[in-house]
UniProtKB/Swiss-Prot annotation:
GO terms for molecular function: ATP binding; ATP-dependent NAD(P)H-hydrate dehydratase activity. Belongs to the NnrD/CARKD family. The keyword NAD applies. It comes from the Eukaryota. Gene3D superfamilies: 3.40.1190.20. GO terms for cellular component: cytoplasm. This is ATP-dependent (S)-NAD(P)H-hydrate dehydratase. It is found in: Cytoplasm. Its cofactor is Mg(2+). Residues 10-366 form the YjeF C-terminal domain. Its EC number is 4.2.1.93. (6S)-NADPHX binds at G148, N201, V202, V203, E204, F205, Q206, R207, D274. It comes from Candida albicans (strain SC5314 / ATCC MYA-2876). One of its GO terms (biological process) is nicotinamide nucleotide metabolic process.
Length: 377
């Protein structure tokens, strides 16, 4: 039903996915998000993803990161919950002798991605990392993996094991950045998991397409060919959502697709993709709540101000696929609009932190500022 809708019509449809803020809702019902990533070298990526999720409207935004990254990310914002549960091979608490450590550091990637290989890495993960991570995952609505993960063997193996655990828990998962590198090496990591979304840029998409024996030229600009390539990648991965970032964002699930042509920023700066990923997490979670009809037919009574408000029923019945695709489109729209505003102010000096200044304004401009999304009766 989304096919051939105009950008304006898609934005209008997206409004019904925006979760209202009701007085009877409790903390966490508007989204419990976790971003898993971040190491000593890369602390900005997980921050931007989790901060974006919070600014767009998630109630609780967590980061699970490597221990050295924890204090740094905590210093960026007191609003995020930081859990330094991950470890890399430089962690002094691993109790490995020098020869073991050197052997692990020189492991070929092929051996790392084998599910049941390397008893030493698996033992470290089972004893020191996974119990804490799993404990938090049991309280989460949607998971983002990959931002700032790096290429450390223990970190990469932990990422694989965490993705497996997310699938066992049947949680929605968004794969970005370094997790897409793993997908390009072993597509089976996420293939056929219906709650997966991958968010490749041009280069990441080409790597994944090549791994699936699909021809994808970096210089390709023909819209129909880009759509066909992305549909083929989605299908070969088991009909998961592929959010292909580019001049125009292309959002595909099997044969269904949406294209976002809203003007963004001409400045390409590190971190914008992480901002998008966080926004996707919040809006996809709301779209899942929409499917659960979390706020349908609810009545809000405010005796002190003498009014009664009734929430609108869903005006158009969307199925799960369309709701998730539309949520991705809405997230893309918010971030593109915010990026355009930031670029108009800062020009060439624009940074991702400037984009975050405009996320709320962009959201309000596109979807309104009504807290309840209600009507008087």
């Amino acid at each position: 039903m989304l096919r051939n809708k105009s950008q304006k019509e898609l934005l209008h449809l997206s409004r019904q996915l925006i979760q209202p803020l009701l007085p009877n809702f409790h903390k966490g019902q508007a989204g419990k998000i976790v971003v898993i990533g971040g190491n000593e070298d890369y602390t900005g990526a997980p921050f931007f993803a989790s901060h974006s999720a919070a600014l767009v409207g998630a109630d609780l935004s967590h980061v699970i990161c490597e221990k050295a990254a924890g204090p740094v990310i905590k210093s960026y914002s007191p609003d995020l919950m930081i859990h330094p549960y991950l470890m890399d091979l430089d962690n002094p608490h691993l109790n490995l002798n020098n020869s073991e450590l050197e052997k692990l550091k020189n492991l070929p990637i092929d051996e790392i991605i084998k599910t049941n290989d390397n008893a030493v890495l698996n033992k470290l993960i089972d004893e020191l990392i996974l119990p804490k991570v799993t404990s938090l995952l049991n309280r989460i609505d949607i998971v983002v993996v990959g931002p700032g993960f790096g290429r450390d063997p223990l970190m990469l193996k932990s990422l694989i094991r965490i993705i497996e655990e997310v699938k066992v828990l049947n949680l929605p998962i968004i794969l970005d950045a370094d997790s897409l590198y793993l997908v390009s090496l072993s597509p089976k990591i996420i293939a056929n998991y219906p709650k997966a979304i991958i968010t490749p840029n041009v280069v990441e998409f080409q790597r994944i397409a090549k791994a699936l024996s699909i021809d994808a030229d970096l210089s390709e600009s023909n819209k129909d060919k880009l759509i066909d390539q992305t549909i083929e990648v989605s299908r070969k991965l088991g009909d998961i959502i592929v959010f292909r970032k580019g001049e125009h964002d292309l959002i595909v699930k099997s044969s269904k697709f949406l294209i976002n042509e809203i003007t963004g920023s001409n400045k390409r700066v590190g971190g914008q993709g992480d901002t998008l990923t966080g926004a996707i997490a919040t809006l996809v979670n709301w779209s899942n709540n929409y499917i659960l009809r979390l706020w349908d037919n609810q009545v809000v009574v405010n005796w002190s101000n003498n009014y009664i408000l009734r929430l609108w029923d869903n005006q158009v019945d969307l199925d799960q696929e369309d709701a998730n695709l539309l949520a991705c489109f809405a997230a893309s729209s918010v971030v593109r609009n915010a990026s355009s505003k930031a670029f108009n102010k800062y020009g060439r000096s624009m940074q991702t932190s400037n984009v975050h200044e405009y996320l709320h304004e962009s959201f309000t401009e596109l979807f309104g500022d009504s807290i309840f999304r209600t009507s008087n009766i």
